[in-house]
Each structure stands twice: as structure tokens, then as C-alpha cells.
Design a protein with these regions (language model features):
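Active-site surface patch of divalent metal-dependent phosphodiester/phosphate bond hydrolases
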Residues: 358-396
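The substrate-binding groove and active-site-proximal loops of carbohydrate-active enzymes
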Residues: 350-359
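Extended non-catalytic accessory segments flanking core domains
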Residues: 4-17, 27-347, 363-370
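Intrinsically disordered, low-complexity, repeat-rich polar/charged segments
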Residues: 20-22
């Protein structure tokens, strides 16, 4: 049987329909798109789409798919493009919301997408209402060869969501690798210099330090993992991307100043105020090394032996004793972290830090002494030792 939807008509026991109640006016529906709109026309040449808030139909070749990990979408690019750069981007992100993975197209599929155009934190996208396979495949997309992205947001806008083949880059920071799977990259073979390492502090926008800060920001690009998950919170049991590989059976350091080469193309994205290189599918520490977008030489092994080559008669070391406080939490109040047996061990909140009880302090001291002796250094600098006056008010 065929069914159609309509307004419900409840009846009472006498089969008489009650008088209709006034209803709030419904939101006007977006008019159906007429024909296929080129992706470049959706993107336009400015920061925002000229077709923002309109419903359009467009078509393209699927170049990236992220059905897992939080991005919840895929990218399409105009068939046959990529050999040369154009004034407007030929690619766009298609947001799928909570649609299941089996409704996503596959890489290299040719599809038609109907959806509403929007700007999501500065990134042009379509929110898909329909996605359908084309009967005739489109011409393949060629990764655009770009040694390095131009500097600044305006110059990078034509590359938004495009499939590109970058040149060599250098790791300039890995602050967020353990949390969001991100690695900061600088174009070429040198990391970006810390401005305050060269120039004196200043808030003057024309000062050398502010100029270099701005220059660094315009050069920086973030290598991402194709996911938005937080490895410190929601994905604690997922191995980190890049430094872990092959189902976490391979561990490979990725250090600042390491030079990386791109063994696979990436998608240019923009989110959270950063331009990004996204792998064409999500990567975690379970991915094979050969499937990662980058390759690099592990520089750590060579550095481990560097200290043995230093000439001299004395060794100098540094050791963080991790909140060595002789003023105990049980004396100055506050809450405590407990061990498996419920014993109070370490200060959680309070005036002091470190050990909560005398027993915990003695245990900490034994471990510190053993570790310091293991350094076998002639001179050792210690950090995180209690400033007694700040706690007790006693200079002694």
C-alpha cells in the first residue's frame, strides 16, 4: 500500500473531529534549486560564499571522507580540476550531521549534492539534504602541486577544501599532538623562530616582535588527523596519530625541527582560526605508516648519543622533583588525592602542594634521591621545590 503524510485528525468516541486549533506558521521551505551550480560559484572569490543561506545543487568528485572522529562530512571537488590554481576554490565541504557512515560516499565517487550553503567558523560548507551517485563518472581530480601555501588568510582562500600535494615542511610545534592530534608546520626546512627569543617584548604593532609574530601566524599551517576528538578526554584509549603507527606497534618520535615530506595528498581546511592540512580519511595510531600523509626520519636516536660526544670533565643535569613540599597538606588543610586503598597521598586543593602526609613525603623523598643518584651528574639543578615563605610566611 502507498501512504502519504498529512495533518492528524483525532476523533472523540463519537467519531467527530474536534474543531481545528490555530497553529504557529511554519518556517518557509527553501525553494528547490534550479539546475546544478558550479562549486566555484558557490565558493566565490571572497571570504564568504555569495550564495550563503541558499539551497543549491552541485556535483563533484569525492576527495576526502570523515565519517568517524567528529568532522562528520566529506569534500567534493569539480571534476577535472587541480592541474592549475584558480581564483575561486573548486572544492567544498559537505556536512552530513548525524547520518550513519553507510550513507557516506567513497573516495573518488562522483556525486550530486543538494544542500544549504553556510559559513561554519569561516569555512564554506553545504549541509547535505540529498547525496546521490552520478550515472556518469566525472573526470578525475588532480592534486594541485603547492610547495607551500601563500601567506595570510586572503591568499589561502582559493585553496579552501582543495586536494593538494604540498612540498617539504618542518615541524615547528607539537603542543597539541597529545590532545587533538595536531602538528604545527612551517614551510621549507626551518622551524619558525620564537619572536621573544630574538626581540624584546612590546605591544606596539610596528615593533619587531609583533611583526614577526604576525609573520609566523601567516606562514603556519597545522597538520591535523581528520578528527576533532580530544585524546585526553573522549579518546583516551585511542593511540595518538603519527607518533604511533601500525595498530600502535610502531612508535616513532616527531620532534620540532624534523622535516616531513608528503607521501599522500591532503585537503586544505580552515577551522578554529587555523589553516590545516587534513588527511583524506581520519588517522589514529592504528593507521599504517604507509597510509599517513607524511613521512620523516626519526631524529631521536641520533640525539640520544649526542651527549656522549661532548668534551669536558663535568656533567650538569636538571631534575624536576614534582612539587617537593615539606609543608604537608594535613597540616595546612585542603583536599587530597587518594591511593587505591583510600589513603590520602597528594594535595588536591589547598595552600600547599605535593605530599599530604609525612608518610607520603618520605616515600617521595626516597624516589627523588634514587632518581637523582641515577643521573650520575656532578652538578644538578632542581625545580618545583617549595617556597616556604609563600606557604608559611616564615623566612626561616
Amino acid at each position: 500500500a502507498d501512504f502519504t503524510t498529512g495533518a492528524p485528525t483525532p476523533t472523540n468516541s463519537g467519531n467527530e473531529a474536534p474543531a481545528p486549533q490555530p497553529e504557529e506558521p511554519a518556517e518557509p521551505e527553501q525553494p528547490a534549486p534550479e539546475g546544478v551550480t558550479a562549486i566555484a560559484d558557490i565558493q566565490g572569490t571572497g571570504a564568504e560564499s555569495p550564495l550563503k543561506d541558499q539551497t543549491v545543487a552541485t556535483e563533484g568528485v569525492v576527495t576526502g571522507v570523515w565519517s568517524e572522529g567528529g568532522l562528520n562530512g566529506f569534500t567534493i571537488q569539480t571534476g577535472g580540476t587541480g592541474a592549475e590554481a584558480t581564483d575561486a576554490s573548486q572544492a567544498i565541504f559537505v556536512y552530513m550531521g548525524d547520518k550513519p557512515a553507510d550513507q557516506y560516499p567513497a573516495l573518488e565517487d562522483s556525486v550530486e549534492v543538494t544542500g544549504k550553503v553556510s559559513e561554519f567558523y569561516g569555512s564554506t560548507q553545504l549541509t547535505a539534504s540529498t547525496v546521490s551517485q552520478l550515472d556518469t563518472p566525472l573526470e578525475k581530480v588532480t592534486p594541485l602541486k603547492v610547495d607551500q601555501l601563500p601567506e595570510g588568510t586572503e591568499a589561502r582562500e582559493p585553496f579552501e577544501h582543495m586536494l593538494i600535494q604540498p612540498g617539504e615542511h618542518t615541524v615547528t610545534n607539537n603542543y597539541s599532538l597529545n590532545q587533538y592530534g595536531e602538528v604545527g608546520l612551517a614551510p621549507g626546512k626551518e622551524a619558525l623562530r620564537q619572536p621573544s627569543d630574538i626581540f624584546s617584548p612590546s605591544t606596539d604593532p610596528n615593533s619587531d616582535i609583533q611583526k614577526l609574530t604576525k609573520d609566523n601566524a601567516e606562514k603556519l599551517v597545522t597538520l591535523d588527523d581528520g578528527r576533532t576528538r580530544d585524546y585526553l578526554k573522549t579518546d583516551q584509549n585511542t593511540p595518538l596519530p603519527y607518533i604511533a603507527q601500525d595498530d600502535a606497534q610502531t612508535i616513532k618520535s616527531l620532534r620540532t625541527t624534523d622535516t616531513v615530506s608528503f607521501q599522500h595528498p591532503v585537503i586544505v581546511g580552515f577551522s578554529h582560526e587555523q589553516w590545516r592540512f587534513q588527511p583524506t580519511t581520519p588517522v589514529t595510531g592504528n593507521a599504517a605508516g604507509a597510509d599517513l600523509p607524511i613521512s620523516w626520519e626519526d631524529s631521536r636516536a641520533a640525539e640520544l648519543h649526542a651527549i656522549d660526544d661532548v668534551k669536558g670533565e663535568y656533567t650538569i643535569g636538571a631534575f624536576n622533583v614534582l612539587n617537593y613540599f615539606t609543608s604537608l597538606g594535613e597540616e595546612f588543610g585542603g583536599s587530597a588525592y587518594t591511593d587505591r586503598e583510600g589513603n590520602k597521598v597528594t594535595v588536591n586543593r589547598g595552600k600547599t602542594r605535593g605530599a599530604y602526609t609525612q608518610s607520603a613525603l618520605e616515600d617521595q623523598e626516597r624516589k627523588i634521591v634514587a632518581a637523582i643518584n641515577g643521573l650520575d651528574a656532578d652538578v644538578i639543578g632542581l625545580s618545583e621545590i617549595e617556597d616556604g615563605y609563600a606557604v608559611t610566611g616564615d623566612f626561616a
